[in-house]
């Protein structure tokens, strides 16, 4: 199944959570923090402005992004994978290599 977000929504695949600390301590699943990074897997058509124009999104499929700890409260399961759906305004930055 494919998910197509509407308007200024973005679908993100969260990066894998760290299961080991920098010191080598293995964390149980409940103690590991969910990362605030992920890859954009789908984007909407853009934000509809008050004058009716559509402003395209600044992120694109494949971008690695950083988002806030409480962003993406809408989680959907697609083909057994949990994906986050959030507004573009919840994305803090794009990671450039």
UniProtKB/Swiss-Prot annotation:
InterPro entries linked: Chaperonin_GroES, Chaperonin_GroES_sf, Chaprnonin_Cpn10_CS, GroES-like_sf
Family, per entry: Belongs to the GroES chaperonin family.
GO terms classed as biological process: chaperone cofactor-dependent protein refolding
CDD domains attached to this UniProt entry: cpn10
Keyword Cytoplasm: yes
Family annotation (SUPFAM superfamilies): GroES-like
Primary location recorded for the protein, binned into one broad class: cytoplasm
A molecular function (GO) term: protein folding chaperone
Localization per Swiss-Prot or TrEMBL: Cytoplasm
Swiss-Prot/TrEMBL keywords: Chaperone, Cytoplasm
Full protein name: Co-chaperonin GroES
Oligomer status and interactors: Heptamer of 7 subunits arranged in a ring. Interacts with the chaperonin GroEL.
Function: Together with the chaperonin GroEL, plays an essential role in assisting protein folding. The GroEL-GroES system forms a nano-cage that allows encapsulation of the non-native substrate proteins and provides a physical environment optimized to promote and accelerate protein folding. GroES binds to the apical surface of the GroEL ring, thereby capping the opening of the GroEL channel.
Taxonomic lineage: Bacteria, Pseudomonadati, Pseudomonadota, Gammaproteobacteria, Pseudomonadales
Pfam family of the protein (one): Cpn10
Annotated Gene Ontology cellular component terms: cytoplasm
Gene3D superfamilies: GroES chaperonin
Record SMART domains: Cpn10
